[in-house]
C-alpha cells in the first residue's frame, strides 16, 4: 500500500513530518527495491550452452551459463539473499561499491560504464547465484567482485586460459593496458593550503619576511620550462591564477612532463638567449621592410644626368671662373657593397654640383625674425645664458690652461700633411675674410622614405687654411674646456675629455623629453647671433681684442671653390669648417633655449651643436615660437619626444645608469656605403671595420630591458616596427665579431687570383718557346742577325727564354707587390702549367697562348 507523501505546509514543516523519512517510508522503499530486483532476476534468461574449443573465441557480448546448468531461472531465495545487503545501503555507499567491483573508467565527470542502480543490484544477485550453482565446467570462475563486473559489462565469467596455465589469477577486466595506468579518482576540493613562514608562523603572503619581488625575479630568471619539457596539458591555468590561491574554484590541472637531458656543454647565462641566425639575406630583408624606397635606389649615373642636362639656378652675387678648373683626380676604385641600403656614391665637386649645394646651404637666407634692438636684447640673452648655465664661483676661480700644449698637439696632428712651424703666416698680413669652400663627398644617410622623389644634396664646408686654423684652434679649445668646467651639474656637453653621454645614476625612464629640431641652422644666423656670441666670449674670459677681431671678419666674407670655379660673398652666417664652428653653434643653441624655456624645470639638459635634449619630471613649459620670431630659426618641437640626440638613443640599464646607442637605422645604411677605397691588403676596409666596432661597443651592455626600450623609442621616432631594431642588433653583433664576417658585406669587381701551392720545391722554372708564325702575326719577327737584346718580360719574344724565379727574385714589374705574389714566388710547380701574364703585372690583355707562346714547366 502506497502512502501519500505529506503535503508542504507550515504545520507539517514545524512538526517535522515534511522532508523527513519515517520508518514506514523506509520500509516501503526497501520493499519496492526488493520487488524490482526479483523482477529483474525472473526476467533474465541466459543463452543455451555452447561448446567452446580452444581455437574459437567467445562472443564478448554474449552471456551463457556453465555446461549442465539448469535452464530454469535462479530461485528467488538466492536473489533475496544476494540483494538484501545492498538494498539497505545508501546511494553513496552503492557508488563506492560500484567503483570497487566494476572499476569504471572516469572520463572527465563521466563513468564508463555508467552507474545503474537496478543493473548493479541484479549483477550482484546473479553473481551470488552463479557461485552457489553446481560446478560443471572445468574452467575457473572469477571471484565475486570480478564476476559482478563481468555480469555488469556482459563479458566472460571465467578467467583466461593463459592465466590458468601460469597458475596466476589475473584480472583481465582491470584494464592494465601497456603504457597506461588507471586509478580511481578521488574527489578533492582543489584547495591548496598556503605556505607558512617558519620564522613568524604566518602565511607567507602576509608575513614581513616574504619577499614577493624576489620570488618574481627568481621565477623570471629560471622557469619550470628550463628543466622540464611539457608533453601534454589537459588544461591551462596561468601563474597569476595559481598564485592567487582561489582554493576550491581552481580546476585541477593534469600535466605530463619529461625530464630534459643534462646538457653536455654549459652555456653562460648571458648567452642563453634564443636568437635567429643572421645572414646577409636577413639584413637585406630588414632594409627592404624598414626603408622601402632605399632598396631599389641606385645613383650611379645621377651626377652624369645633372652634368649633361639643362641647368637653371637663381643666385645673387655669384662669380664663375671656368678657365682654371682642377680636373678630377682618378682614384683606384671603391669596394662594392652587397647590401643595398640607399647609400649614394661619392659626389664630385663640379660646377653644377657646387652651385646646387650653395643654393641649399648658403644662399636664400630666411628672414623670419622681427625687428628688435640688437644691442640691448643681445646683452639680455647673454645674461640669461650665464644665469641659467654657468656657476659663477667656478668661472671666477678658473683660468686658461693648456693653450700652448694644444697648439703643439695640433701641429703634431697635421705634421704628416706638411704643416710645419716655418709655414705659419702672420695673421695681420692675411685677409681672414677669404674662406675656401668645398662640398662633402659623403652624403648623410637619409632616413625618410623620399629617395624615390628627392635627390639628397651634399653639405658644404667653409674653412680657413690649416696654417690659419692652427693659430685660433688652441685658444678656442682651451676656452671650451674652461666653459665645460664652469657649467652647472645638470648641463652636459657630450664632447671632450671631461664629458660624454654616459650618465651614471640617471634614469631616462618615466621622464618627459623635450627635443627641438632647428632647420637651416648655419645660414639662419645673423648679426643678432654674432652679438650674442661676442658677449658670451667676453664673459667667459676670452681677450676682448681677439673676440672683436674674430667677429669682425665674420660679418662679411667671401667664399670660393677653386675646383669648381665658383665664388660668392656671404655675411654673418656660420662658417662650417673654422676653429669656432662647434663651440659657436653650441652656445647659440644654449642661449636660444634658455630664452625660450626656464632651465630650472629640467633635471638634465644636453647640448651638442644644433642638437638639444631636456629631461623633466613634469611636462616642460615654454614658448618655442620665439625660436622663429626672435632668433630667425625654423624650429620644430619633436612629438612624440624620445631621448635622442646626436643620432643616438639614450637607454638606461637595470642599475639606473644611462648610456648611448647609435641609431640602428643609420648604422644599417652605413653597412652599404660605397665610399670605401679599394686596396690589395684591405687596409681601408679594415679601418672602416674598426670604426664600426668602436661605434657599437655598447652591444655588451644591451640586456633584454634595454632592447625593449630601444624598440619602443625606435617605433615612436620613425613610426616603424620596433622588432626590426632588435633584428638589427643581431646583425651588428655578428659583423662586429671579426673582420672576416665584416668582409662578407663588400666585394670588388677587380679580378683577384689566389695562387695556392703545397709543393716544397725550392725553385720554379718557366721555359717559353715562341713560334715564328705567331711572332709574325703580332709584328715581332726579327732577323737572325739582329743583335738587339730580347726583352725579358713575361712573354717578350725571342727564340727561347729561360726564367728562374726564386724566393729572392721579383716576378713582375709592379711597384707594390701583393701577398699573393710573395706566396707565388716561394713555391714551385713541377707539373705542366699555363701562367697568365696578368698575374705578373706585365700584360693585362691577352693570355700567353694568344701571344704565340708555349709554356711548359
Swiss-Prot record:
UniProt cross-references to Pfam families, sorted A to Z: RdRP_2
Keyword set includes Lyase: no
EC number(s) reported in the record: 2.7.7.48
Domain called RdRp catalytic: residue spans: 511-624
Key words of the record: Nucleotide-binding, Nucleotidyltransferase, RNA-directed RNA polymerase, Transferase, Viral RNA replication
SUPFAM superfamilies: DNA/RNA polymerases
Listed Polar residues bias regions: 804-816
Biased composition (Basic and acidic residues): 780-789
Enzymatic reactions: RNA(n) + a ribonucleoside 5'-triphosphate = RNA(n+1) + diphosphate
Keyword field contains Nucleotide-binding: yes
Oligomeric form and interacting partners: Interacts with replication protein 1a.
Function: RNA-dependent RNA polymerase which replicates the viral genome composed of 3 RNA segments, RNA1, RNA2 and RNA3.
Name used for this protein in its record: RNA-directed RNA polymerase 2a
Organism of derivation: Cucumber mosaic virus (strain Y)
Amino acid at each position: 500500500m502506497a502512502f501519500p507523501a505529506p503535503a508542504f505546509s507550515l504545520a507539517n514543516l514545524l512538526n517535522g513530518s515534511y522532508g523527513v523519512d519515517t520508518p514506514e517510508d523506509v520500509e516501503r522503499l526497501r520493499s519496492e527495491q526488493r520487488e524490482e530486483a526479483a523482477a529483474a532476476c525472473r526476467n533474465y534468461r541466459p543463452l543455451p550452452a555452447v561448446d567452446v574449443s580452444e581455437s574459437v573465441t567467445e562472443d564478448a557480448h554474449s552471456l551463457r551459463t556453465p555446461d549442465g546448468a539448469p535452464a530454469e531461472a535462479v530461485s528467488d531465495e538466492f536473489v533475496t539473499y544476494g540483494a538484501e545487503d545492498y538494498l539497505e545501503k545508501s546511494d553513496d555507499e552503492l557508488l563506492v561499491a560500484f567503483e570497487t567491483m566494476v572499476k569504471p573508467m572516469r572520463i572527465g565527470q563521466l563513468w564508463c560504464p555508467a552507474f545503474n542502480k537496478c543493473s548493479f543490484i541484479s549483477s550482484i544477485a546473479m553473481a551470488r547465484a552463479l557461485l552457489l550453482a553446481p560446478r560443471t565446467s572445468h574452467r575457473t570462475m572469477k571471484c565475486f567482485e570480478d564476476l559482478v563486473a563481468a555480469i555488469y559489462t556482459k563479458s566472460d565469467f571465467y578467467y583466461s586460459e593463459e592465466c590458468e596455465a601460469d597458475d596466476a589469477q589475473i584480472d583481465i577486466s582491470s584494464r592494465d593496458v601497456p603504457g597506461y595506468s588507471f586509478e580511481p579518482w578521488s574527489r578533492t576540493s582543489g584547495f591548496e593550503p598556503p605556505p607558512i613562514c617558519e620564522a613568524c608562523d604566518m602565511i607567507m603572503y602576509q608575513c614581513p619576511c616574504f619577499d614577493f619581488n624576489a620570488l618574481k625575479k627568481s621565477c623570471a630568471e629560471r622557469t619550470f620550462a628550463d628543466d622540464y619539457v611539457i608533453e601534454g596539458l589537459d588544461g591551462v591555468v596561468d601563474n597569476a591564477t595559481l598564485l592567487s590561491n582561489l582554493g576550491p574554484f581552481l580546476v585541477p590541472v593534469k600535466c605530463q612532463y619529461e625530464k630534459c637531458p643534462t646538457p653536455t656543454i654549459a652555456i653562460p647565462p648571458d648567452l642563453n638567449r634564443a636568437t635567429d641566425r643572421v645572414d646577409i639575406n636577413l639584413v637585406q630583408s630588414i632594409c627592404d621592410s624598414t626603408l622601402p624606397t632605399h632598396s631599389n635606389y641606385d645613383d650611379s649615373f645621377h651626377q652624369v644626368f645633372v652634368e649633361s642636362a639643362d641647368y637653371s639656378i637663381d643666385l645673387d652675387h655669384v662669380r664663375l671662373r671656368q678657365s682654371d678648373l682642377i680636373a678630377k683626380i682618378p682614384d683606384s676604385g671603391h669596394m662594392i657593397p652587397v647590401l643595398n641600403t640607399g647609400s649614394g656614391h661619392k659626389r664630385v665637386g663640379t660646377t653644377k654640383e657646387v652651385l646646387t649645394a650653395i643654393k641649399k646651404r648658403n644662399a636664400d637666407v630666411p628672414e623670419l625674425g622681427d625687428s628688435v634692438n640688437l644691442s640691448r636684447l643681445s646683452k639680455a640673452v647673454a645674461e640669461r645664458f650665464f644665469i641659467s648655465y654657468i656657476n659663477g664661483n667656478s668661472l671666477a676661480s678658473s683660468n686658461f690652461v693648456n693653450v700652448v700644449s694644444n697648439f703643439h698637439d695640433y701641429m703634431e696632428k697635421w705634421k704628416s700633411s706638411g704643416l710645419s712651424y716655418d709655414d705659419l703666416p702672420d695673421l695681420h698680413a692675411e685677409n681672414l675674410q677669404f674662406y675656401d669652400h668645398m662640398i662633402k663627398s659623403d652624403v648623410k644617410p637619409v632616413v625618410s622614405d623620399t629617395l624615390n622623389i628627392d635627390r639628397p644634396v651634399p653639405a658644404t664646408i667653409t674653412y680657413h687654411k690649416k696654417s690659419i686654423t692652427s693659430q685660433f684652434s688652441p685658444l678656442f679649445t682651451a676656452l671650451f674646456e674652461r666653459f665645460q668646467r664652469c657649467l652647472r651639474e645638470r648641463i652636459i656637453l657630450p664632447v671632450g675629455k671631461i664629458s660624454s653621454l654616459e650618465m651614471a645614476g640617471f634614469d631616462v625612464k618615466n621622464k618627459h623629453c623635450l627635443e627641438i629640431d632647428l632647420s637651416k641652422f648655419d645660414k639662419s644666423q645673423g648679426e643678432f647671433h654674432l652679438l650674442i656670441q661676442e658677449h658670451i666670449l667676453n664673459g667667459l674670459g676670452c681677450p676682448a681684442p681677439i673676440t672683436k677681431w674674430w667677429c669682425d671678419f665674420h660679418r662679411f666674407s667671401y667664399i670660393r671653390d677653386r675646383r669648381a670655379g665658383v665664388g660668392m660673398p656671404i655675411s654673418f652666417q656660420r662658417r662650417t669648417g673654422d676653429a669656432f664652428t662647434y663651440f659657436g653653434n653650441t652656445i647659440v643653441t644654449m642661449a636660444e633655449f634658455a630664452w625660450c624655456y626656464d632651465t630650472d624645470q629640467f633635471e638634465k639638459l644636453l647640448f651638442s651643436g644644433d642638437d638639444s635634449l631636456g629631461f623633466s619630471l613634469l611636462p616642460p613649459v615654454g614658448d618655442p615660437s620665439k625660436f622663429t620670431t626672435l632668433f630667425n630659426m625654423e624650429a620644430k618641437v619633436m612629438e612624440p619626444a624620445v631621448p635622442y640626440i646626436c643620432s643616438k638613443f639614450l637607454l638606461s640599464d637595470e642599475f639606473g645608469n644611462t648610456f648611448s646607442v647609435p641609431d640602428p637605422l643609420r648604422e644599417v645604411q652605413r653597412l652599404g656605403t660605397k665610399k670605401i677605397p679599394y686596396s690589395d691588403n684591405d687596409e681601408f676596409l679594415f679601418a672602416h671595420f674598426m670604426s664600426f666596432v668602436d661605434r657599437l661597443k655598447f652591444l655588451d651592455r644591451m640586456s633584454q630591458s634595454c632592447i625593449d626600450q630601444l624598440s619602443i623609442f625606435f617605433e615612436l621616432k620613425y613610426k616603424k616596427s620596433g622588432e626590426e631594431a632588435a633584428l638589427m642588433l643581431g646583425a651588428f653583433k655578428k659583423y662586429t665579431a671579426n673582420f672576416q664576417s665584416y668582409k662578407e658585406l663588400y666585394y670588388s669587381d677587380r679580378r683577384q687570383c689566389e695562387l695556392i701551392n703545397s709543393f716544397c720545391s725550392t725553385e720554379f722554372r718557366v721555359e717559353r718557346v715562341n713560334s715564328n708564325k705567331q711572332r709574325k702575326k703580332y709584328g715581332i719577327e726579327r732577323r737572325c742577325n739582329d743583335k738587339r737584346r730580347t726583352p725579358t718580360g713575361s712573354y717578350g719574344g725571342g727564340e727561347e727564354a729561360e726564367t728562374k724565379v726564386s724566393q729572392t727574385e721579383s716576378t713582375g714589374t709592379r711597384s707594390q707587390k701583393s701577398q699573393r705574389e710573395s706566396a707565388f714566388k716561394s713555391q714551385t710547380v713541377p707539373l705542366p702549367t699555363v701562367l697568365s701574364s696578368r698575374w705578373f703585372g706585365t700584360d693585362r690583355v691577352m693570355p700567353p697562348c694568344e701571344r704565340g707562346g708555349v709554356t711548359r714547366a
